[in-house]
């Protein structure tokens, strides 16, 4: 028996780093307009990064944005099978990042670039399976302890996964069923 699997289309949006000479970041609204309209973004991607960048001088801002360049912001997976559901994705995933600077340059370091560590603090995965009743999960990750210090190896200290109940679509929804959550500490 012949087995056939239709081709798939994966759309992936990456952080562009610095666009332009003045340290501008790609406009989030421009990026969001390209997303599948049935699944608006639920994770604020720009605010945590913007807060980090606002404290930096231009050369350091360039180094921070260089560290973020190429980070995956969102992925959508479709099947190109010619059916009426071809425009509905199987899965939508989005991620939110924060920046951590370590080993700031000292007085004897001259003009060396600053070193930033971009890390994922939240991920949302919605499994549409081309239907109308998606399953949504969030994964929240904390890398710092109460004193704001990172693990010596950059490992997450706390990871929490939340599965949203059926019928849940937005953060303002109040579903009848309970959320399911697991948390682990290292």
Which sequence ranges carry the predicted segments?
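Non-catalytic interaction/targeting regions
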Residues: 1-186
């Amino acid at each position: 028996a012949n087995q056939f699997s239709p081709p798939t289309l994966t759309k992936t949006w990456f952080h562009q780093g610095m666009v332009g000479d003045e340290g501008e970041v790609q406009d989030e609204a421009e990026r969001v307009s390209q997303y599948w309209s049935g699944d608006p973004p639920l994770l604020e991607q720009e605010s945590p990064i913007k807060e980090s960048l606002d404290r930096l001088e231009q050369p350091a801002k360039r180094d921070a944005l260089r560290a973020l360049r190429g980070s995956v912001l969102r992925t959508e997976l479709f099947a190109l099978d010619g059916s009426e559901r071809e425009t509905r994705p199987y899965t939508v995933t989005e991620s939110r990042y924060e920046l951590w600077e370590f080993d700031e340059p000292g007085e004897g370091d001259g003009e060396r670039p600053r070193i930033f560590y971009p890390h994922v603090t939240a991920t949302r995965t919605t499994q549409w399976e081309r239907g109308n009743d998606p399953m949504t999960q969030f994964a929240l990750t904390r890398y710092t302890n109460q004193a704001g210090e990172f693990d010596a190896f950059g490992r997450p200290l706390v990871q929490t996964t939340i599965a949203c109940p059926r019928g849940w679509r937005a953060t303002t929804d109040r579903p009848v069923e309970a959320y399911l959550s697991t948390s682990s500490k290292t």
